[in-house]
Amino acid sequence: MDNTLKHLAIIMDGNGRWAKLKNKARAYGHKKGVKTLKDITIWCANHKLECLTLYAFSTENWKRPKSEVDFLMKMLKKYLKDERSTYLNNNIRFKAIGDLEGFSKELRDTILQLENDTRHFKDFTQVLALNYGSKNEISRAFKSLLESPPSNISLLESLENEISNRLDTRNLPEVDLLLRTGGEMRLSNFLLWQSSYAELFFTPILWPDFTPKDLENIISDFYKRVRKFGELKC
């Protein structure tokens, strides 16, 4: 199997703790985190990756204080509108995954507009996971399978393909490297199906402090690893 890094997935963790260390409100950390998101996205677009998926808002994040959730929704809408030129100027295709029905119509329309405006770009895709949870995604895929089953599924491999083709990430490569910033060592219900053979990397660097140079170092480590995909390799 190909060892090339095509799909990088990132759990962007540490905005709130970063702000607290600076005696600032959590919103300050989220704003700085958006700048990091932009910097990392442009770096990936310029370094021949095919796909970057960023965990922006989980299905569990609705449990946060309403004031913080409201701020995040406003910030997301502003980002998608303000950075339209960034996507167009850097040939970045934008895609959102997750249960978008959980958002307001205005925000959904903003998401769909940027997807439509960038759909013609082919070389690099930035994916934002929004109102996303892997269990929710897999459940929706099974629901779709039950509601419109194929004529015959005789082999387990066929069943796996049917599920994969009903996930939000269909037509995207499987995850090669899953990175989490902020020091926590858990996957937090993120791309569990797609990361079955991904290399995992956990860094203590808080997301607002994370730089393209840090990413370069992690990718260098990725290429030193031997990816076996279940095989025996000498």
List each language-model region with its residue ranges.
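Flexible, compositionally biased loop and terminal segments
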Residues: 1-234
